[in-house]
Amino acid sequence: MIVLDTNVVAELMRPAPAPGVLAWVRAQTTGDLYTTAITLAEVRYGIERLPDGRRKTLLRSTADEVFGGFEEQILPFDARAALRYATIVSGRDRAGRPIEGFDPQIASICREHQAALATRNATDFEHTEVEVIDTWSVTN
């Protein structure tokens, strides 16, 4: 199981995604790729804060298309993930490497499901015990 981080999903929404990222995603088995409710929220928030207009409408449509491809493969931030979140955040705090925002929620979902995380921001997930795949540097 591989979870796509927000930056990977956002890249797939671009009119011309980075060729390496697109090739990497296409090389995976569709059933192995997941994303999270956190990523869905981040992407939708980014779209909804835009002024009304053509760009916002286009991005809504693109997001519907991309997330529609996941249907049953959007993992929730549930009670078990919340417990892992507490462990991740407190562990990083003790190590002097605080982690904030949505990243620890995504990391906790990955840990709960024993999933790797495809992301461009590998350093953001250091010391979370999540296997990280940098889709911008992977060669296919």
Where are these regions (language model features)?
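Alpha-helix capping/helix-boundary segments
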Residues: V8, T39, A81, I106, ...
